Amino acid sequence: MSKVIVIGGGAAGMIAAIAAAQKGHKVILLEKNEKLGKKLFITGKGRCNVTNAADMDVLFQNICTNEKFLYSAFYGFDNTRVCDLLEQAGCPLKTERGDRVFPVSDHSSLRCFQIILRT
């Protein structure tokens, strides 16, 4: 078993730590703040808006002017895979108006990420 250190407990850092742990690595997640996912904590009016369920082409049309710049990043780990990762790890999700995706619990405490990261 190899060891992985992830620096930064934001959304990307938490997802990287979860993905590494699911592949059998021993993971240490380092974060300078007292809470993980500090910015994610305030999304969706405090309910933890984890992603958007819209088709990738629709997302590109609405969020960027240079689609080619973000294409590989978005298709390397798209919104469907984010949802699958969280649900497989025990965080049920729901999709609301505007294709916004939230934990079913509607809690902004990021418990779904914290539970996954502790296992």
Sequence positions of predicted segments:
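N-terminal Rossmann-like FAD-binding beta1-loop-alpha1 element of flavoenzymes
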Residues: 2-29
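Short, contiguous strand/loop micro-motifs
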Residues: 3-4, 68-72
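A secondary-structure boundary/capping signal
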Residues: 7-10, 32, 44, 78, ...
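Gly/Ser/Thr-rich helix-start
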Residues: 9-14, 38, 45-47, 91
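Conserved N-terminal glycine-rich FAD pyrophosphate-binding loop of Rossmann-like flavoproteins
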Residues: 33-64
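Glycine-rich phosphate/pyrophosphate-binding loop regions near the starts of catalytic domains
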Residues: 62-64, 73-77
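A general alpha-helix detector
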Residues: 65-69, 81
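Feature captures the FAD/FMN-dependent oxidoreductase FAD-binding
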Residues: 76-119
